[in-house]
């Protein structure tokens, strides 16, 4: 936050930041709801990862696409045409098969149980889907960088309170300087930049399309792990990657055939 707020002020400029902050003051109850679902997503995600096998956790996290598509169909009339298309449904199915192959890499899933950890992962996926729905519903006019920073400003005290109540030890854990540097860089790139771009994309792309493209994350993770960490990329993962890319391409084609004008309409009366 010490970096994000100065960045927002510098990039928006004095005049625009004043106008945008007025919008934030009007929308703060809705931003608080968005921050709450962001907090719940992160809380359930971490709790789930500690309780199930990483492969199972990654697969369960991808159930978010099912929640996102279902909720988008119920809430946004302009996304229903996309969801009804056979090519979209085939693309999603192909992408999910690709995700499964990419994540498992042919490894056995024996030993993984549908226990409390699995429930946490599914709740995390549901919280993320609701988080996405509310972003598109409520804050399309707020600059994405300001929206990201405001939501994190609201959510951060919740994380501190949870940490203290859980009795997990010092609020500031002991770690070497290199670890803190790595955490800072990953936070700025992965959270600051990633969330800002996600906020910016939702009003233009819609929840359904943005969630579908999110299925590429396991593939990118496998590729980066191979390039940077030297982790083995198995042939079955490569096949999964091809299926995933093909499925996402089909989804993209459908999205821009059904909504070629770019920015999607906001539902009326919400």
Predicted features along the sequence, with ranges:
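C-terminal-most transmembrane helix of multi-pass membrane proteins
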Residues: 10, 78-79, 179-181, 214-270
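Specific alpha-helical transmembrane segments that line the substrate/conduction pathway
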Residues: 2, 46-80, 124, 207-226
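Membrane-interface helix termini and inter-helical loops of multi-pass transporters
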Residues: 18-19, 47-50, 103-116, 164-182, ...
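Hydrophobic/aromatic residues within transmembrane alpha-helices
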Residues: 32, 48, 74-80, 138, ...
